[in-house]
Amino acid sequence: MESVQKLTHIEHVLKRPDSYVGPVDSTTESYWVLDGTCFKKKTLKYSPALLKIFDEILVNAIDRNSLHPKAVTSIGVSIDKEAGSVTIENNGPLGGISVKMHEKEGVWNPELVFGHLLTSTNYDDTQKRLVGGRNGYGAKLTNIYSSSFA
């Protein structure tokens, strides 16, 4: 059984992206797109995986608004085609992500939250929540597939 391989979770995410974010190959489809003040049907070429990564981090920003509706007054998206970057930000509080060492895991809390798969504050099913992120993948998938994540 020399052909049996064991991958780390991150290696698996990178080797089998379709399991986590969908197909990476570009597809072409027609969509209604806002063009100025009206919608027009346009043919778009895009990567479903890239769209999913964008969606995952956008949902994280929106979840901050769900948890702190009066504190979050702005969610911004900036796309820089020349730099090849997408920036999503909100002005909400970090919501309990303290910059200190996590006692049990031995890593900094922000690293645990944004860099370790399957970590989440939304695993307590006894609490009613209206959030998109529940499984501990969202921001981490964006981080894994990004060349820069801050």
Regions found by a protein language model. Name each.
Residues 1-150:
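GHKL (Bergerat-fold) ATPase N-terminal catalytic module, capturing the glycine-rich phosphate-binding loop
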